[in-house]
Amino acid sequence: MATRAINYINKQNSLAPEKPFFMYYCTGTAHAPHHAPKDWIAKYKGKFDQGWDKQREETFARQKAQGVIPENTKLTQRSDGIPAWDTLSADRKKVYARFMEVYAAALSYADYNIGRVLEAVEKTGELDNTIIIYIMGDNGASAEGTVNGTTNEIATAANGVTEDISYLLSQYDKIGGPETYNHYSYAWAHAMNTPFQWTKQVASHFGGTRNGMV
């Protein structure tokens, strides 16, 4: 997708360098399924072993440090129905962390390719003359993966099929690859909506509706 976008930019600049151009670049990321090359997934091995509760705290602290949220902001409580990370078995932690590693890899890979597109604009000499609007999504992070996550979001979301931990462990190395249509646990979705509560499916809370824009 990025390569085609770059070719389009180069073609427009070659044919009519004085003419403005418009591009709508819309990746599937971070909508499920979360897919990424294996080497990108490997970069995040162990990065989420601390779990979703600690991840919320770390994200919240970083948001304050970067001025994304006011200094007096208070972190919302873990929403009802989301288990505390410290109460989970080792197998559950392993599976849940894997889903998040894959999600992070998919997001990073998308960002990398957006960077390639911006570099192409820069090479035309028009970067400072270009308006770039970056919208991160159309809703909050999604809870459709259920508590366990899933390797087949369509079966889970549309038909109510759930996958137990033993099955997910058997699919561990396939998660994020072409044989899966994976989605992470709704607890990770909640963590990704920090500092707000809830997720895409709960529009009464900002966790379901707020999105970043640059």
Segments predicted by a language model, with ranges:
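Active-site-proximal cap/lid insertion segments
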Residues: 1-214
